[in-house]
Amino acid sequence: MFFTLFRPPFVLAVAVTASAIPAHAMECPEAPDHSTPLEALMGEVQDAESETQAREIANRMWEYWADAPNAQAQAILDRGMTKRSAFDFLGALADFDQLIAYCPEYAEGYNQRAFVHYLRRDFESALTDLDRALELSPRHIAAMSGRALSLYGLSRLEEAREALAAALKLNPWLPERYLADPGGPLAPPGAGDVEL
């Protein structure tokens, strides 16, 4: 979904050191353009033969999505993700707010803040951030699936169904795919109906 990326310990050390730098200390550069390798990985995940293989490919996608525009932005992103993983949702929101204020054109800032909103069951705020993330990065599969889950949380089932279908076209191995299985809450209407 919108979520996780393991960062080695040395990145966390950099994050702690860089956290003392105010976000307004310099202007955020443009986010790196990883569209070419991401498109290649999307092709690979569509051809994956197992869930394990697909997960490995998805993890490589995360490395690109979570590649912030510079070291300062990376430190803020990593710090927020660490706080989120420790269930410090308010601290994570503060970090992602800071990241978005500093790098308003960086999609992952919105995606990560959306995840925190989602975990807090604030689906409307999650949806707003996911829509912005997708404006900036239209084929961000994790944001697409997060959007589907947020719409589902708002009981907007038809929109959730469409959002999940779009994400599954890019990665048919998403963990959320089971929601669209026959009998699932986001299954197409009539899927799984038994004729008598």
What would you call each of these model-derived segments?
Residues 22-78:
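N-terminal leader/linker segments that initiate helical-solenoid repeat arrays
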Residues 46-47, 152-176:
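TPR/TPR-like (Sel1-like) alpha-helical repeat modules
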Residues 70-136:
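Alpha-helical adaptor scaffolds
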Residues 78, 112, 146, 180-181:
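Canonical tetratricopeptide repeat
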